[in-house]
Amino acid sequence: MFDIVIRGGVIHRGDGEAPVEADIAIKDGVIVQIGNDLGPAGRVIDATGQIVTPGFIDIHTHYDGQASWDPELRPSIDHGVTTAVMGNCGVGFAPVREGDRETLIKLMEGVEDIPGTALYEGLTWEWESFPDYLDALEKMPRTIDIAAMVPHDPLRVYVMGERAVFSEPANENDISEMRRLTREALEAGAIGFATGRSDVHKTADGDWTPSSEATRDELTGIARAFAGLDFGVVQAVSDFNLERGEQDFDEEWQIVADYAKASGRPFSFSLMQRDFAPEQWVKLTKLSEELKQEGVDARMQVAPRAIGVFLGFNCTFHPFMGYPSYKTIADLPLAERVAKMKTPEFKAQILSEKTDKVSGPGSSVPPLADLLLEHIELVAEKFFQLGDPPDYEQPPENSLASKARAKGVSIYEMIYDTLLERDGQELIYLPLYNYTELNYDNVLKMMEHPQALYGLSDGGAHVGTVCDASMPTYMITHWTRDRKRGRRLDLPRVIRMLTGAQADYLGMRDRGYIREGMRADLNVIDVAALQLEPPYMKQDLPAGGQRLLQGARGYTATIVAGDVVMEEGQLTGAKPGRLYRAGRAQAIAAE
């Protein structure tokens, strides 16, 4: 008898080919048979009129801290993700000496907007080395699988101490030791190595990240830790010295390219369109094509929508938080704040005021927020009321600036009234990247590039302003069904981007496809009913910290290693997820 049989579903195998209608039998966590009229099972899932897909693989998350205390890893599990890769952008929590723990917390707080108070209370610190960290992660039963890359920042701090924090160049001994520790981590099961070189990434104190100015010798020296290995990937995030000029751009690209070449492994970097350099992404795609022609398996991580932030009264930032009148009520519960703000007297008072600075020492708000406030009338051309259901590709006439002009009110009043809707829980969406032309035509071009990978969800990060772990659901609903402002994508292609293509890049040979003998990581989805819900704030992080979550309707079941972990939007309590150890997993899959 089989453990589970999924009957009558339309199977998307993860290979991008046309789907087929068939049944799937699962036994001992593995897909054992695909066909019709399969034998009896302990449980039958009726998938008639629905699709069955491999479990989604998210290659770009930041659950590095959360994974040590949270077995569920929401919101990723809410959107069909069965494997999440963390350690991206070079930030993480291992290796670490006891005296450097605060440094790494401030780094993660600043770069990825994860509350330091939650990290201080939640992190278990059962490790020093990276292999220790993997062992600690392995102890916890969890809902989905996780895999971890070696992050450059903690590695540099571990080897160089304060010299790393002050961005001193690494010497030969430093590089040799970082290479040795990276190799040690890879042999223990790390799935790769990641570095961060973005000028916008700063610590909570406003300092540069330790790896942001690492030299070519350092990066290529560490990358040679992969010599002789047949597994592992390397990742980088960089803005390629965008604001420093063309010569600096070319030099930065060459450093990153040399790093990729030295590793001999598949390489990916983040690709997005920035308003102040709207054609840079095109140049990067061409350079990536050239790098591939040189023999590097070069990929570009792309997002299926804008990289944006939410503004709201419970979010990390909203436009009125620096106003004197608002500060007098800022600590009140939301309902009391809303009641006060709805009074004509309070509204008139606050709209007569000017804002104070909101960033600076002790503030979780980045300096970018003050820049936005200085130019809010211009920025508001890209302020959109998210709505229910959420709409991430809205036309210019829907912007709050356009609505304010049409209504004959100031942009400040328009923002004020909008944020008070839904009892103060309404969100304003500000697409920062990928929305220069106020549509997703360029996003479509990125997604269709043969070297594109779905990425950049940042699951677990930017918890007070972003909830892009919902992107897998959005890829299906928007790009295959709902888009009205341009061309769509075929469903088999989108499913492949979420599954088989990810597994191929990562070298995960036991998942990503629906085939006999593969691990039974699966989604049963009612595509007609599939719908994103609005993001909402939940106060469930350690130390009372809050984060944005986002649900979805239409996932009938999510299965991990043969166990149903999510059913009709509810966790079942099953925890079959584990730490994926690269190298070891590849060896088992090859047997």
Name each region found by the language model:
Residues 2-4, 10-55, 535:
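Histidine-rich, glycine-flanked metal-binding segment
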Residues 9, 29, 49, 60, ...:
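Divalent metal-coordination and catalytic microenvironments
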Residues 12-23, 427-437, 443, 490-493, ...:
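Acidic, glycine-enriched loop/beta-strand segments at the rims
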Residues 69-192, 228-229:
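Divalent-metal coordination cores built from histidine and acidic residues
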Residues 133-137, 143, 149-159, 168-172, ...:
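Active-site neighborhoods of metal-dependent hydrolases
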Residues 367-368, 445-452, 469, 524-570, ...:
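C-terminal cap of metal-dependent C-N hydrolases
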Residues 413-419, 490-499, 514:
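Short, well-structured alpha-helical segments that form the helix of a local strand-helix-strand
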